[in-house]
Amino acid sequence: MIGIVLVLASLLSVGGQLCQKQATRPLTTGGRRRHLMLWLGLALICMGAAMVLWLLVLQTLPVGIAYPMLSLNFVWVTLAAWKIWHEQVLPRHWLGVALIISGIIILGSAA
């Protein structure tokens, strides 16, 4: 159960980061202020919810185990940037993602 909460906290944190990125995207038409407020508002909601879930995680897991699990954020952000904004991801970056996933699996088996 706490693993699910940890993944949700990670996804919400990443959602907040992605909303911040979207807030910086140029618009082809007017409404810049509305666009900015919408995405930054969503970012605050996501990050606030992530913080609440993170506090639940910290009540259960030692911080030395829980915190490295947030490395999942790097994986989610890489995948989202690649899919949503078609950002180029170099092979060495994918290797880094694979190493992060390996580390999470190793740490997760110790929890």
Curated annotation (Swiss-Prot):
Entry keyword set: Cell inner membrane, Cell membrane, Lipid A biosynthesis, Lipid biosynthesis, Lipid metabolism, Lipopolysaccharide biosynthesis, Membrane, Transmembrane, Transmembrane helix, Transport
Q: Which InterPro entries match?
A: EamA_dom, Flippase_ArnE, Small_drug/metabolite_transptr
Enumerate the Gene Ontology biological process terms: lipid A biosynthetic process; lipopolysaccharide biosynthetic process
What are the residue boundaries of the EamA domain, all occurrences included? 40-109
Query: Matching HAMAP family, A to Z?
Result: Flippase_ArnE
Q: In which family does this protein belong, per the annotation?
A: Belongs to the ArnE family.
Its name, as the record gives it, is Probable 4-amino-4-deoxy-L-arabinose-phosphoundecaprenol flippase subunit ArnE
Species this chain originates from: Salmonella typhi
